[in-house]
Regions:
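N-terminal extension/subdomain marker
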Residues: 29-130
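A short, glycine/acidic-enriched catalytic loop
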Residues: 99, 140-169
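Structural recognition of the beta-strand scaffold that forms the well-ordered cores
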Residues: 37-42, 69-74, 132-136, 176-180, ...
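Active-site groove signature of glycoside hydrolases
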Residues: 123-143
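Mature extracellular/periplasmic domains of secretome proteins
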Residues: 57-61, 161-165, 189-195
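Secretory targeting signatures
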Residues: 1-31
Length: 218
């Protein structure tokens, strides 16, 4: 099932029953870090490839600042078009993919849980923040799958495992929020699977419009 324009958005926020005190899993003083880290996993190697550019441009309108880090991993429809960006005001700072994972070339599989894990390890280590938000961006099919990439996709158990592994490596506490900019991901089954990995889960119970979230209001 895919994102379509005419439908209204119904959002579901599910709060974990056991919120965790926020800490930072690195040597930097928490007070010196930006309050918010916004890490966006943009799986656009499908019919949403043009929306990757549109949403990235919206993020550039805001840009990272003393209170906010915006970091993205993007993939679009053509080959050799995967990129890791630190989004700044009206621009981006790109990190070569081989610096994140030495096996990565210029085309990565966004439907692989290892890709999500490696992105989060890199993004939260290089651009740490007091409160961390992971957004998984793409088509969604509820508990069945999300982040489609030429036949591969992420399942919800894969997402849980990816976040568990990233947290084990970095020592980070549960995320402040996991958000799905994708259709049909506001399900109790999804929230239950991810309940130990984030304080809040945010997703749509219905179809999202093609444009998805509005990122120029971060």
């Amino acid at each position: 099932m895919y994102r379509v324009r005419p439908y209204a958005i119904a959002l579901l926020v599910i709060i974990s029953a056991f919120p965790t005190t926020l800490t930072v899993g690195n040597a930097e003083s928490e007070d010196s870090l930006p309050e918010w880290g916004f890490y966006v996993y943009m799986a656009g190697d499908n019919t949403l490839y043009e929306e990757v550019t549109d949403d990235l441009n919206e993020m550039k309108m805001v840009g990272s600042n003393n209170n906010l880090e915006i970091v993205t991993l993007t993939d679009q429809l053509l080959g050799n078009d995967s990129h890791a960006y630190h989004v700044i005001k009206h621009g981006v700072e790109e990190t070569p993919l081989s610096e994140i994972n030495t096996t990565w070339e210029n085309e990565i599989d966004m439907g692989d849980g290892e890709t999500l894990k490696d992105f989060m390890v890199w993004a939260t280590t290089e651009y740490p923040a007091q409160r961390k938000i992971l957004v998984i961006w793409d088509h969604g099919s509820g508990w069945k799958k999300v982040a489609e990439d030429q036949g591969s996709y992420l399942t919800v158990p894969e997402i849980r495992k990816s976040i568990e592994d990233y947290r084990e490596i970095t020592g980070d506490p549960p995320l402040t929020l996991i958000g799905f900019d994708a259709c049909l991901m506001g399900m109790f089954e999804i929230a239950y699977e991810l309940k130990d990995q984030a304080e809040m889960i945010h997703g749509s119970e219905a179809y999202e419009p093609l444009e998805g979230w509005t990122y120029n209001h971060l």
